[in-house]
């Protein structure tokens, strides 16, 4: 009764059952279909919906600066049960509180700057070349290939090298090592951990009650510490992430334990999201062959050799940019909300007062597929980013795949360079055919913060072109 009629959120729209009880929301989190259910609620109830007794979901474009940016004076802290830490007590860039985050980010900004990216281009391109080589072998064999798996191999190898000065060897072996496989299993386990933590179960108790989770967590932490520790002992001029941290480190900088903890976070955040995006881009292009032909024409007429495809040159391609933006819209790599807590003073979010202590977040999947924001939201239509007057009323400012504010994605420069270049070189090298088994690849994917994806089976045909 209190939750329905006396709670500070009682006036907000949403189903009565959700206003009274937590279990509908937590059940969806456990199942992995939370973004689909929330999308239905937003279509029914509007831009602000009460999805649980103490939780609001909001999809207004102007909410980004209020929830995640600096649209108000009072800070919006991260929801603690969502951003639980592993066994390490050291801060990492995602789970750190605001003061630790500012200190850590100050150093990592050097590692992810445009200048650093230029020095890392050769390293990154070497892995893209290996990706193309391995896919070319598959094309010659004439069998269909799981493109999603190879994109994962490439992005993990790139991020591993840039983090530890060591590749994971996934592209060479054409399989992930056990540590990366453990990372994927921890994503789903994280949903259960967050639910139990929300009900007041301490994180360490959760691991105590579920030993298999504790073993996976400890294996992840141990492997990260070993890799990062080996890198910290190296004397090298190679321009990886840690080289910049060490160069600019001081008494206000990062401890070695914090470097190790943050390295593990960067591996997952910098690899899985890019691979997910690229898989989505390939899928939607193959489902919409007219757009694939337009992209092929742009890339294959702009460049005369593959060596001309560089970070700088691909950044100027208008068709490629439109396709990337539409892919972000229809298939965001991070579809679910990353919740914050409203401050003690309460806060105005997109013109609406939110009381103190309320969980609030913006689910990208719901915001980007809203019929209030986009014409034909379920249609893959890159022309909405090419000036088509039909889509002039689209609220494109709601699309923020890297978030906003002081805690936005620090690796977005790298991500942009990586996805542009990999996609351009794939289209330069191969004609592709989506296999029937993957005809509805996006349907029914579950989400545990990131997407849980099936194989993306594609037949590749190598073009006979100059390298």
Where are these regions (language model features)?
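N-terminal membrane-proximal hinge/A-helix region immediately C-terminal to the signal-anchor transmembrane segment
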Residues: 1-103, 118, 125-134, 154, ...
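Cytochrome P450 I-helix active-site segment
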Residues: 17, 121-125, 175-185, 239-241, ...
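Cytochrome P450 heme-thiolate monooxygenase catalytic core
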Residues: 76-85, 118-278, 294
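Cytochrome P450 heme-thiolate "Cys pocket" and heme-binding signature region
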Residues: 90, 264, 269, 308-315, ...
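Short, small-residue alpha-helix embedded
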Residues: 273-286, 422
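Cytochrome P450 heme-binding "Cys pocket" and the immediately downstream C-terminal segment
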Residues: 289-291, 412-450
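Conserved cytochrome P450 K-helix/beta-meander segment immediately N-terminal to the heme-binding cysteine loop
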Residues: 343-344, 362-390
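C-terminal helix/juxtamembrane-tail motif
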Residues: 451-467
């Amino acid at each position: 009764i209190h939750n329905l009629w006396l709670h500070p959120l009682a006036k907000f729209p949403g189903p009565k059952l959700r206003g009274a009880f937590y279990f509908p929301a937590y059940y969806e989190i456990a199942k992995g279909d939370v973004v689909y259910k929330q999308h239905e609620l937003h279509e029914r109830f509007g831009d602000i919906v009460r999805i649980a007794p103490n939780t609001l979901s909001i999809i207004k474009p102007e909410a980004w600066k209020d929830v995640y940016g600096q649209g108000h004076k009072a800070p919006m802290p991260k929801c603690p049960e969502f951003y639980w830490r592993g066994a390490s007590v050291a801060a990492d860039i995602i789970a750190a509180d605001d003061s630790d985050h500012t200190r850590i980010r100050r150093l990592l900004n050097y590692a992810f700057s445009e200048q650093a990216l230029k020095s890392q281009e050769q390293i990154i391109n070497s892995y893209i070349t290996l990706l193309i080589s391995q896919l070319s072998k598959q094309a010659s064999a004439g069998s269909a290939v799981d493109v999603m798996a190879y994109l994962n191999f490439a992005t993990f190898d790139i991020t591993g090298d840039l983090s530890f000065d060591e590749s994971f060897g996934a592209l060479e072996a054409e399989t992930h090592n056990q540590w990366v496989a453990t990372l994927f299993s921890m994503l789903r386990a994280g949903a259960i951990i967050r639910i139990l933590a929300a009900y007041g179960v301490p994180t360490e108790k959760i691991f105590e009650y579920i030993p298999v989770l504790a073993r996976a967590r400890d294996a992840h932490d141990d492997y990260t510490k070993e890799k990062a520790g080996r890198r910290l002992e190296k004397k090298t001029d190679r321009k990886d992430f840690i080289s910049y941290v060490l160069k600019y480190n001081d008494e206000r900088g990062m401890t070695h334990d914090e470097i190790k903890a943050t390295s593990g976070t960067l591996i997952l955040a910098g690899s899985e999201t890019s691979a997910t995006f690229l898989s989505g881009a390939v899928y939607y292009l193959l489902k919409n062959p007219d757009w694939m032909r337009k992209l092929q024409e742009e890339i294959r007429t702009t460049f005369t050799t593959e060596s001309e495809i560089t970070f700088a040159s691909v950044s100027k391609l208008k068709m490629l940019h439109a396709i990337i933006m539409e892919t972000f819209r229809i298939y965001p790599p991070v579809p679910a909300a990353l919740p914050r807590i409203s401050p003690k003073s309460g806060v105005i979010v997109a013109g609406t007062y939110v009381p103190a202590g309320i969980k609030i977040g913006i689910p990208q999947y719901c915001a980007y597929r809203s019929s209030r924001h986009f014409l034909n939201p379920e249609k893959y239509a890159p022309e909405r980013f090419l000036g088509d007057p039909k889509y002039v009323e689209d609220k494109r400012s709601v699309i923020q795949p890297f978030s906003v504010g002081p805690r936005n994605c620090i690796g977005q420069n790298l991500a942009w360079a990586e996805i542009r270049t990999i996609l351009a070189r794939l289209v330069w090298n191969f004609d592709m055919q989506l296999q029937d088994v993957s005809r509805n690849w996006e349907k029914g994917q579950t989400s545990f913060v990131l997407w849980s994806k099936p194989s993306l089976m594609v037949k590749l045909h190598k073009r006979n072109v100059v390298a």
